[in-house]
Amino acid sequence: MQTETFDFIIIGAGCAGLSLAYRLADTKYKVCVLEKNSNNVVTNKNWSFWKTYNHPYEKIIKKSWDSFSVSYEKQRAVVDCKNYPYQALKSKDFEEYTKNKITNSNNINILYDVKELQLKDMKDGVEVSSSNFKLHCNHVFDSSPVNLNSSIWQVFKGLYIEHENLDSIFKIPHLMDFTDQKKDEFHFMYFLPFTNTSSLIESTYFSKKENLEKLSEDYIKQFIKDEYKINSYNIISKEAGKIPMSLHNKFQSGRYITKIGSYSGVTRPSTGYTFLNIQKQIDYLVKNIDTKNYNFRYKPHSKYLLFMDKIYLSIIENDAKKGKIITFRMFEKINQNTVIKFLSDIPTIADIFKIIFSLPKLIFIKHLLKVLRNE
């Protein structure tokens, strides 16, 4: 079997893999992307984030908002985010946009239906093989899933619906609605209005289990009926997924292999926000790729934020009701730019202290000590 040689091999054509291939398109590097699914498989998810970092996908942003709201029981807080607009991007649009550039480039190949890959470190790179090909490259960027020992998972299920009067409910995103009856669990509803007649309504848990058993489509339908007083609507599509809220991911898998994407540690443990963190990681890799020193040491989160996340996740895991109250109060009481920067990995030291001082002192100290005992 003849071995074909590449500069880089990218494993996985998800958000991270396609983002990296998109940046490397039409460069001097010869690149091969290996994807386990067929070319016909298209994901249908919504990626949302505050625009705190410039990304190259502004043309395909589905919608952008200058404010959003959160609620707890009968209290509602409307938050201004003009400085950092809340943006929504459809994964389907992202895949089409990036693949269009990649497939029209002269330096990137994409192979689909790739199963049972074997990676072998060589003295001058990596040998990547399957039953029907053998490849060699200088470096592998691997976005494939790995088994994680995560204590908490964010699991979600959503319905895209059409109804003539949806704009009468919320005209802006309702990011966290804690008004349901699941008081002993960290659960919230999420409402994203794309047009006057179409919205995404999602049920989200922070759960110790990574399965989707808690997520009931019937619950979402009942919530729409009880809270929004809507009995008849069209379901356009559905989405479901899980995000590890892990604090222990590794970035480097070997001398010639670098993990990228969700399973490399870029996902913010306390929020699950991933898309912009992937773009930051990819920009770092592309910027440093010309040095030919592939011992990348990218750290997506500061040690201070990770420590704060440990405390926050400890509260959620052990006292979900207080976790919901704290989350709501943070949006209600603290300057909106401070909160958004904190949740988006770009806070100043002053922002971090403002967040700390806003927390209920007894709860903060209790879980601070709990985290320190487990260090």
Could you describe each region identified by the protein language model?
Residues 2-33:
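N-terminal Rossmann-like FAD-binding beta1-loop-alpha1 element of flavoenzymes
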Residues 7, 138, 257:
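Conserved acidic residues
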Residues 11, 142-143, 259-261:
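Redox-cofactor binding/interface segments in oxidoreductases and associated redox assembly factors
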Residues 23-74, 157:
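N-terminal FAD cofactor-binding segment of flavoenzymes
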Residues 51-113, 121-124:
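A conserved beta-strand/loop capping segment in the N-terminal third of enzymes
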Residues 105-231:
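Predominantly flavin-linked oxidoreductase catalytic cores and closely associated redox partners
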Residues 181-183, 207-285:
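FAD/FMN-dependent oxidoreductases across multiple families
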Residues 283-375:
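C-terminal helical "tail/cap" subdomain of flavin- and related membrane-associated enzymes
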